[in-house]
């Protein structure tokens, strides 16, 4: 009997003696390797689309030619970007190597999506100041950290209380891009507001504990090693969500961090009110003149191309100033 390809229900329920479904096996393999929740959702989505594209044939009966056909269809018919096509390829290679134990190797003769060479949008200091002036409270603090510390949005939202060192004016980013740790500067201008914010978060955490909650999702297997760490103050998110919910990967009800879409919407509104015509998002706040002079490993660029691109921005900004 072939494996079922859908994953509408979770395995392990009452009377469930059937083998794990394919997409559940994919999820297990991803979680075993401690990939992010976003990666899990993306990979499962691409694998499901690949199966549907080939009329629900089991991937074990398919191979490199079928992968090539799917990727070419994405580029020619769906006109996806190069990064999207690469993500789909990564998902399928993961499926064959780590789930089906059928390494594919090199996939040849794929029509590649074109990678446009674009410089990132760069704001002047004055423009950043105007955008920040239209942010308030928690969103202003997040905007300041994106701008002054050079954090990516997910890195900022995943900060734990223990990651902020007020004595050294330093922020530790744990398992950032490329699963690397790094340290960056805590802007002096945000310290007072951040301290007040954390005092409010601590009161919220105390109230959660009194109500029988107060647990937070922990990375890797830390929860099994240290069962009480989930309720400790240092492990709480700096920017917690407004409500308690159940995380499918974590289990018990907990207060997750603020959702990225909330920050994206707040910055979009601030940009609109500022009258700035550029296409600005949270990542744009990371690109500012003073931060570009720092070494690439401090900024978190995993390759030299990121630093070279920022040098091009400096030249562009100098000519347009």
What are these regions (language model features)?
Residues 1-321:
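Conserved catalytic core of the tyrosine transesterase superfamily
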